[in-house]
Amino acid sequence: DSSTSRGLGDVYKRQKYYNPQAPGDQNSGMNIITMRYADILLMYAEAVHETSGMTEEVWNKTIRPIRERAGFTADAALNFPAGKSKEEMRQIIRDERRVEMAMEGLRWYDIKRWKAGNEYLSGKVRGASFVDENKLDTRKFEEARDYLWAVPISEINLNPNLAPNNPGYGN
């Protein structure tokens, strides 16, 4: 898969917003970035791929500069992977987004936009352990409920035309 070709496996090293010279644990003084250029490039790569297919030209303007900025130099990581199917290329772009945007709070929205909840949000919970108290071992993504938020009851009370609530939520 594409994370293996990047030499990452399943390991993430948290470097975002980290300043090794800052005193204390959370005193970096670095501003939180709400949107990054890499996010724009990845959205563009995804949109082009879904509408007309990824090309080497688009790859070299989007994915390649992201990987170069991250320090990759191997041809396997930088060069356009010619001969991939539409689905394989889609997965490469999604994996790139997963790695590049890690811990920035966008993954949930990506999965919902892709309508890929059953693939990514069901089954065994994997990933880093941040808090030992979390004992969730498995989860079940429910398509009818989990792609939409509940309409707040206060809004339904103000405007009864909003009833009934979205599937999976009471009124």
Residue ranges of model-derived segments:
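Acidic/polar-rich alpha-helix caps and helix-coil junctions
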Residues: 5-171
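Short, well-ordered junction/capping motifs at the entry into regular secondary structure
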Residues: 1-2
